Design a protein with these regions (language model features):
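Membrane-interface helix-loop junctions and terminal tails of multi-pass membrane proteins
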Residues: 1-254
Length: 254
């Protein structure tokens, strides 16, 4: 444990948490995002590896159940910097709350993958994979496009299912439909690994660095990582916010 907390990416994110975590009445949001990120990763990433390994449809079913369960357990946290950015753009939260939530999301991500590795080794389970792309197999342009479009579709679905459509009043129905949208994106826009979540892309990359020779946790050194998961992802989220703003009359960064 001491060695884990000696790596500078872990120190940086923990420092951000210390600064942003106690922000007044947003403490509950911080805890919800932290716990929600942990639950989301465990319940959704384990589908097809720890549970539902018997076939494609079983994997789909367990993943959908994980989407619903993760949201229900914690009470609907964002668990995604791109989604949190859309709420900032549409005036639903302030900059300080944005930082508070994102720091908690990162803390959850950077802690959960090593914990899952330890759990998998202890119970002799296969370690699940995460969102990544191989430049030798996938063009950079394709990865950018897929990540941006998938994030755009996810955010539009969240707006419609949670704020506009009648189904928003039925929790199980709207979360199940959200799971369908996520699975659709995973199948159709896979060039980037389809994170649809900058935190997942970067925390998984940090975790993979510890699996390499030397075992050091490090932020990705390739700029293409940040272009794909952050620039493309945030662009998709902001375009979805702008589109929703134009359709609903809501101010965009007003």
């Amino acid at each position: 444990i001491a060695e884990f907390f000696s790596h500078w990416p872990v120190i940086a994110i923990c420092t951000l948490c210390v600064i942003c975590g106690p922000l007044g009445h947003w403490r509950k949001d911080f805890v919800d995002e932290l716990v929600g990120s942990v639950v989301m990763i465990v319940t959704q990433f384990s589908a097809g590896s720890w549970v539902g390994a018997g076939g494609h449809w079983q994997k789909w079913g367990w993943h959908a159940g994980g989407v619903v369960l993760a949201d229900w357990i914690v009470g609907g946290p964002h668990v995604n910097p791109a989604v949190t950015l859309t709420n900032l753009a549409l005036g639903k939260l302030r900059y300080a709350e944005f930082l508070c939530r994102v720091s908690a999301q990162f803390a959850g991500g950077i802690l959960t993958f090593p914990i899952c590795r330890w759990f998998a080794k202890m119970f002799k389970l296969p370690m699940f994979g995460g969102p990544t792309f191989d430049p030798a197999k996938v063009s950079f342009a394709a990865a950018l496009w897929d990540e941006g479009v998938a994030t755009f579709i996810l955010c539009c679905a969240i707006f419609l299912l949670n704020w506009e459509l009648p189904v928003r009043k039925n929790y199980l129905a709207k979360q199940s439909l959200t799971a369908v949208v996520i699975r659709f994106n995973l199948e159709m826009f896979s060039s980037s690994g389809c994170a649809m979540n900058p935190m997942l892309g970067t925390c998984w990359a940090i975790f993979l660095s510890s699996e390499a020779e030397g075992g050091r946790y490090a932020f990705p050194g390739d700029p293409s990582h940040y272009w794909c998961y952050w620039v493309a992802g945030f662009t998709g989220a902001l375009l979805a916010s702008l589109f929703y703003s134009l359709c609903s009359g809501t101010q965009f960064f007003g």
